[in-house]
Structure formats: C-alpha cells, structure tokens
C-alpha cells in the first residue's frame, strides 16, 4: 500500500461539516425521495416487462434488448436501495460518533462491483438500441430474419463496453479511504472522469444517429403509405417509426438524467474550488444527483406509456376502418383515390 493510500485509510472520521450533512433533515428527506424513486421504478419495470411480453409494438430484437436492460436496471436500483438504507441506518445509530459514520471503501466491494457495472450497462444500452434501429432500417430483410441473433450480438458488445469501462476505472486501484455511502467511488480512481466523458460522447452520438434514423423512417413510412398496398410492408414501416420514436425519447431522457447528474456534480466541484462551499452543502446536493437511478425510472415509463398509446391508436384505426366501410372493395377504391 502506498503512502497516499495509507493517508486515506487514516482518515476514518467524518469532518464536522460532513457529519452535519449525513445526519441532517435534508439527507433524511433525500433518503425518502430516492427510495420512492426506486420503488416506483420497480412497479413500472414490472408493467413495462409485461407490456413488452404481451404486445408486439416493438420488434423481437428491440424487445429482447429492452427486457435485458430492464432486468439490469432492477439490479442497479436494488444496489442503490441497499446503500441508502445502510447509510440511513448509520446516520441514526452513530449520529454522535463521527468516526463510525463513514464506510471503508474496501468493505464496499459488493456494492461497487454491482453499482458501477450495472450503471455502465444502463448507459451503453443506448449503443445497442441505436444500432438495432440502424440495422432494422438499412438491412430490413436480414434484420427480420435474424432478430434474436442481432439482439444477442448487440447485448454482448454492450457487455464488453461495460467490462472495458469498469476495468479501466477500477483495475489495480486500491480501495483505500472512507466514503459517505458505499456507492461512492474510491478516491484513487483516476480514470473515472475520462470514462464518464466517453459515456457522454457515446450518448450524444447515439442521440444524433437515432434522430436521423427516426427522420428517415418517418419519410419512408409516408412514402410506403402512399405507394404500397402490402399490409406487411405498411405495418413494418409503421413499426419502425413507432420503435424509433420510442427509442429516441428514451435515449434523450436517459441522457438528460445522466447529464443533470454529471453537470451538477462538476458544477459543484467547480464552485467549491472557487468559493468556500461547505461539505455539508456539497453532499446535501450531490445526494440528489444519482443520474442513472432517474434514467432507470424513465426507461420503463417510456416503454409502458408508449405501448399503451400505440395500442390505443392501433385499435382506433382498426375500428375506423371496420366501421366506416362495410364493403372491402369500396374501401380499397377509397384508398386508391386517397393515394392518387
């Protein structure tokens, strides 16, 4: 163990400002707030998985990717739940003992090895979903013939990106020092910021690509609706638009959540370096910025409500088509006239 690690391990007592932050009313409110977010995410994750399983709004490839991402989010949210409960317990039991408030980083191995990989996996889900949309549009025939192979391949790549990021950040890093919560990274993780920048770049690139694919899908669907009488071709175009729109919304929301967390933390660090912001204020604000936790709530919300909306719209369209025109020939003639 080097000198820096030894120094960090010697600082086992929380400062007065940090102690005040950890036992404050604000932190207790934050505990209730984060627990509520996690519990709501559990409910909507279950509803979203049911929606994906029972309805064919999304393609089989997209559904498989989304289900795996939802299951991963459950693990991440559960890790967040456990770390907040243990922190709240210590803040109550050891509120007058600053030297027992903090967690030794080496005692948080279980949490670290779940929280960060699942967080990276959630972030890199945008990579899989974006390429899923690209392949579905530009290699449509191949995509529909090999959906499960494509989904599995993209998930493997997503996992490799996750493992690579985790390896860069944590490999060979001494888990020295003490942290306020077990999901806080050890101080000696020097590449943490660099990997965050890579994640941000990946998400921005995926947003741009997904928006482009959505735009192209909308144009393509309008053209097909005018020129094609094939129900299969028309439905495939409609499915591409619906799925691309949902994925685009999901990626933008996930990016927004993570950027609020990243930008907020960096801004606080910048302000702290320029002015005398106390640890109490710093940790009180940072505790409200777990971006991936919020992103893991947004994903099932988008899936569930988008599925309900699309199902309702589909039923309305079918009802209009079947109620207004009793004769199939008359309906086809009308479609021909409207497409001229």
Swiss-Prot record:
This is Serpentine receptor class alpha-18. Its main location: membrane. It is found in: Membrane. The chain crosses the membrane at residues 29-49, 109-129, 149-169, 198-218, 249-269, 285-305. It is a multi-pass membrane protein. The keyword Amino-acid biosynthesis does not apply. One of its GO terms (cellular component) is membrane.
């Amino acid at each position: 163990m080097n000198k820096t690690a030894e120094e960090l391990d010697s600082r086992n007592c929380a400062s007065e400002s940090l102690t005040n932050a950890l036992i404050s009313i604000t932190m207790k409110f934050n505990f209730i707030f984060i627990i509520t977010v996690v519990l709501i995410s559990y409910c909507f994750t279950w509803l979203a998985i049911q929606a994906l399983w029972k309805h064919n709004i999304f393609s089989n490839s997209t559904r498989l990717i989304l289900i795996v991402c939802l299951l991963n989010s459950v693990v991440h949210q559960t890790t967040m739940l456990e770390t907040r409960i243990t922190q709240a317990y210590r803040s109550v039991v050891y509120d007058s003992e600053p030297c027992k408030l903090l967690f030794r980083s080496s005692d948080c191995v279980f949490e670290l090895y779940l929280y960060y990989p699942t967080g990276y996996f959630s972030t890199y889900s945008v990579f899989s979903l974006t390429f899923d949309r690209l392949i579905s549009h530009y290699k449509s025939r191949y995509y529909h013939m090999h959906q499960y192979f494509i989904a599995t391949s993209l998930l493997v790549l997503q996992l490799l990106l996750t493992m690579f990021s985790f390896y860069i950040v944590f490999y060979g890093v001494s888990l020295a020092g003490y942290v306020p919560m077990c999901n806080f990274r050890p101080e000696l993780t020097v590449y943490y910021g660099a990997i965050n920048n890579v994640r941000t770049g990946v998400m921005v690139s995926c947003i741009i690509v997904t928006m482009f694919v959505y735009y192209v899908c909308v144009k393509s669907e309008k053209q097909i609706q005018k020129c094609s009488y094939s129900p299969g071709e028309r439905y495939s175009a409609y499915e591409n638009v619906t799925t691309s729109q949902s994925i685009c919304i999901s990626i933008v929301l996930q990016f927004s959540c993570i950027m609020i967390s990243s930008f907020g933390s960096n801004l606080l660090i910048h302000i702290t370096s320029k002015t005398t912001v106390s640890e109490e204020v710093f940790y009180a604000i940072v505790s409200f910025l777990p971006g991936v936790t919020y992103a893991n709530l947004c994903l099932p919300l988008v899936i569930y409500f988008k599925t309900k909306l699309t199902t309702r719209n589909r039923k309305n369209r079918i009802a209009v088509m079947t109620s207004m025109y009793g004769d199939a020939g008359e309906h086809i003639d009308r479609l021909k006239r409207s497409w001229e």
